[in-house]
Amino acid sequence: MIYLRKIDPLRNMARFYVLDLQPTLFGEWALLKEWGRIGRGGQCRCAVFPSRAEAEAALARELRRRERRSYVRVGDGA
């Protein structure tokens, strides 16, 4: 699980973004994304991929996209 956040007090911005890869019951891989304001419930989206390699590539793309938008990695979950 990868945790990202973006905090900008001047713009009253406190956002989080979580990315996670999980296997499905049907042998596919799911990229789970959750985002929202820190301290509030967020929104979720799940994208399913036929192979782990494709899911990892999508995760890397999303991570680059978030880092370009000034999100900072705050830690990896267990």
Task: Annotate the PLM regions.
Residues 41, 49-68:
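A short, charged, amphipathic alpha-helix used as a generic interaction element across diverse proteins
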